[in-house]
Design a protein with these regions (language model features):
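Bacterial Sec-dependent signal peptides at the C-terminal "C-region" and cleavage site
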Residues: 3-18
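N-terminal, active-site-proximal structural segment of metallo-dependent hydrolase catalytic domains
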Residues: 15-47, 53, 59-64
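Beta-strand-turn-beta hairpins that frame and shape the catalytic cleft
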Residues: 15-22, 146-155, 176
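Conserved beta-strand and immediately adjacent loop positions that scaffold enzyme active sites
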Residues: 21, 100, 114, 123, ...
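Cys-nucleophile CN-hydrolase/nitrilase-fold catalytic domain and related Cys-dependent amidase chemistry
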Residues: 43-120, 185-197, 201-204
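Short hydrophobic-aromatic micro-motifs
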Residues: 54-55, 152-158, 178-179, 207
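Active-site catalytic loop in hydrolytic enzyme cores
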Residues: 79, 106-172, 186-193, 247, ...
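CN hydrolase (nitrilase-like) catalytic-core segments centered on the catalytic cysteine
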Residues: 81-97, 163-245
């Protein structure tokens, strides 16, 4: 497989410290309700304190199953892409932090699950999910996103990417890998195990941020958001099923 990396080095900041404060937002999502989710995440962001990086779950403005409650809502959610991106930029500027989460992006007749990383200067970088769980639901992206921020090289991934060790192989020397997800509780043991494996095999901190609660079809999400150290052991974790914000300081090896 030929892997294209988008490695960006222009966001190192003015001070290259050896620690990074990461806010994990494990949230109950309002499925299909963009306005409700944007309002709720705006309130959550205000409670993050002095974080350097703020991480939301996958598809934070809508939830992941676009057919829940009847009808496919991908086009409806994709039409709000500009509003969602502007909110991420606003929060990043106001909090002086990198704020990241994924949403639906449309290009022609193709839909992508796009992670947006918004920076304090108002600029954004993007990663389109490569390993898609359901064929046809989203088109796969072709490249990876790895960027420097405050002395840390950070790689970004989305949910099902976690199962593919080669896709996140640390060939670029990243310090932190971020996985945003809507990962159901029925496979929570896999989520916990794979986060630890990716950290240990790549000798990098791994951040996993999942949604929590129950969706309209009764599918339960345990959350299990947390940060794993380079030794494969948990540094800190959110409580099961809880709408919770946890700010954790990690140190560069």
């Amino acid at each position: 497989m030929c892997v294209l990396f988008f490695v960006v080095s222009g966001y190192a900041g003015t001070e290259r410290g050896q620690s990074l404060r990461v806010a994990l937002i494990q949230a109950h999502l309002q499925w299909g309700d963009v306005d409700g989710n944007l309002k709720a995440f705006g309130e959550r962001v205000e409670r993050c304190g002095e974080a350097d990086v703020i991480v939301f779950p996958e598809l934070f403005a809508s939830g992941c199953e676009m057919k829940k409650g009847g009808g496919d809502k991908k086009a409806e959610i994709a039409a709000r892409y500009g509003d969602i991106r502007e909110k991420l930029k606003e929060w990043a500027v106001n909090k002086k932090a990198v704020v990241m989460g994924s949403t639906i992006f449309a290009e022609g007749d193709r839909y992508y699950n796009r992670l947006i990383a918004a920076f304090p200067d108002g600029k954004c970088l993007y990663y389109d999910k490569h390993n898609c769980f359901k064929k046809g639901a989203f088109s796969p992206g072709e490249g990876q996103l790895i960027f420097d921020y405050k002395g840390f090289k950070i790689a970004t991934y989305i949910c099902y990417d976690l199962r593919f060790a080669e896709w996140s192989r640390n060939t670029t020397g990243y310090d932190v890998a971020v996985y945003v997800a809507n990962w159901p509780a029925s496979r929570r043991e896999d989520w916990q195990k794979l986060l630890r494996e990716r950290a240990k095999e790549n000798k990098a901190h791994v951040i996993g941020v999942n949604c929590a609660g129950t969706d309209p079809d009764g599918l339960y999400y345990a959350g299990d958001s947390g940060i794993v150290g380079t030794d494969g052991e948990w540094i800190d974790r959110c409580d099961e099923g809880k709408d919770e914000i946890k700010v954790v300081r990690i140190y560069k090896n």
